[in-house]
Amino acid sequence: AYSYAMVDDSRLVLRVLQESISAGGTAINYSKVSELLLEEGQVQGVVLNDPEGSDGIRLRAAAVINATGAWADRLRNQVNPEKRIRPLRGSHLIIPRNLMPVTDVLTSLHPDDKRGVYVYPWEGTTVIGTTDLDHDEDLDIEASINNAEVDYLLQAFNVQFPGHTISRVDIISSWAGVRPVIGSESSKDPSKERRDHAVWSDNGLITVSGGKLTTFRLIALDALNAALPQLPNAKPFSDERVFIAPDLTAKEL
């Protein structure tokens, strides 16, 4: 069921960071890699923007993994100019739950392009999504839904649920995200691009991109194992360790 893949993404990210710190890692918030440290053509670390200075903070590392999503090509361009990422935008609408009080995930095909559109409950509201189109805007500007996407999602909902028709005045809010899809020369239709993840190694820089949040552990495992040749004392990584769910109710979380 689709409901098995529903997750609070912000909590998931924080949990992963907490697990990393507990294992001896260091998390540096509000930091941005401005350039790669190169020695004899090989990546040996990164330079972080220093909010309190102009020189930047130089960090050396045995292995550097570029897991920057839709921005992956921007960093990778310093060692390989080949473009691999096709940024695709997915947008959602949020409406009051009483207008469509679903208790599980419902899916249907859009009447125009036969793409899957989902309606599901979330935090006391109902969400309608998603779209799938090339995101040609500046990646440094937060992505947002456009008018055509709003019409697209409203049409899908109203065709599927003629007894619960809605309009723009019913929309509480919306959000949009940019998918780091691996581009191909064979597909012009965004929805026909493969959603697999891929890992590349360029002059010591490991880049991982693509995939879906539901397979984030496998994606991380493949990226870590790709870095093994640069970590001579490390053992092959495994996916045996799992998160231990806290003994709390949903309200206590």
Q: Where on the chain are the PLM-derived regions?
A:
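Short, surface-exposed charged micro-motifs
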Residues: 26, 35, 60, 116-118, ...
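C-terminal catalytic lobe of FAD-dependent flavoproteins
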Residues: 9-11, 15, 19, 74-78, ...
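Conserved N-terminal helical subregion
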Residues: 14-22, 30-33
